[in-house]
A protein has these predicted regions:
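GH16 jelly-roll
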Residues: 29-264
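Bacterial N-terminal signal peptides that target proteins for export
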Residues: 2-14
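Bacterial N-terminal signal peptides
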Residues: 13-23
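Sec/Tat signal peptide C-region and signal peptidase I cleavage site
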Residues: 24-28
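A general, composition-driven signal for non-globular sequence regions
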Residues: 4-5, 21, 179
Length: 264
């Protein structure tokens, strides 16, 4: 997400996290494997927190609120909604963050992307200056203006590296699909529905190497993101659904979203 958000906004977001003490937890040793199936429970479970704050800058048009998160038969729904007239931003959106950091390993999400001009839905890892680190980031970002594609990118040691907007071969807003990436010391490989989709090699590019925090969110692009996401009209409403998120370190055989559901 933060690869396309102005630096001042990035600092504001991270500053809020620092003020709430999350940064202290993030400095702990990276956590081990976990599997969160949102389609079989009605709560986030241990290890997650919901963002609930406003970023006071004209460059970012979305305030995070707990009220934009709900459970349905499909899993965890994150919504983008027009904010009330008295609100400080035009939109209310939703964001969920992992409390502890993760590092090298496999990351998976089963989700349905949000559709709509200027809408962004995502899964990514992030750390940055307010955690005492240079910015490192790995992303899957769905631009609601064309959900037959996905934006994959990474940030390493504070350097913005080239992103790719790639054809999926299907519409990611029509239903759930499995998205994954392997983050390893010498490469990052993105996957879609179990098939290799895109890769970058360490011999060709600088790669992120600092443990980060898993985040997923839905938000509205504005003039600052116009060339990338488009601008969301002020009456825009959109939803993304998340069924499952999992992580395991290299060499681990812990269960993942891609494994069959027991008894399913």
């Amino acid at each position: 997400m933060f690869s396309n958000v102005p630096v001042g906004v990035q600092r504001a977001v991270a500053g809020v996290a620092l003020a709430t003490g999350v940064a202290l937890a993030a400095q702990a040793e990276p956590e081990g494997a976990f599997l969160s199936r949102f389609d079989t429970q009605d709560r986030l479970g241990e290890g997650w927190q919901v963002s609930h704050f406003t970023i006071r800058t004209d460059d970012f048009r979305t305030a995070w609120t707990r009220d934009a998160i709900a459970w349905t038969a499909e899993g965890l729904t994150l919504s983008l909604l027009p904010a009330p007239e008295e609100a400080e931003t035009p939109f209310h959106g939703a964001e969920v963050q992992r409390v502890r950091r993760t590092h090298y390993g496999r990351y998976e999400v089963e989700m349905t992307a949000a559709r709509g001009m200027g809408v962004i839905s995502s899964l990514f890892t992030y750390t940055g200056p307010y955690y005492g680190d240079p910015q490192d980031e790995i992303d899957f970002e769905f631009l609601g203006r064309d959900t037959t594609k996905v934006w994959v990118t990474r940030f390493a040691k504070g350097e913005r590296l080239p992103g790719q907007w790639l054809d999926l071969g299907f519409d990611a807003a029509d239903g759930p699909h499995l998205y994954a990436f392997d983050w390893l010391p010498d490469r990052i490989v993105w996957y879609v529905d179990g098939e290799e989709f895109f890769r970058v090699e360490g011999e060709d590019y600088t790669l992120p190497d600092i443990p980060g925090r898993i985040m997923f969110n839905v938000w509205a692009g504005g003039p600052a993101q116009a060339d990338w996401s488009g601008v969301a009209p002020e009456d825009m409403e959109a939803q993304a659904e998340y069924r499952c998120i999992s992580y395991r370190p290299p060499e681990s055989s812990a269960p993942m979203c891609s494994d069959p559901v027991p008894g399913g």
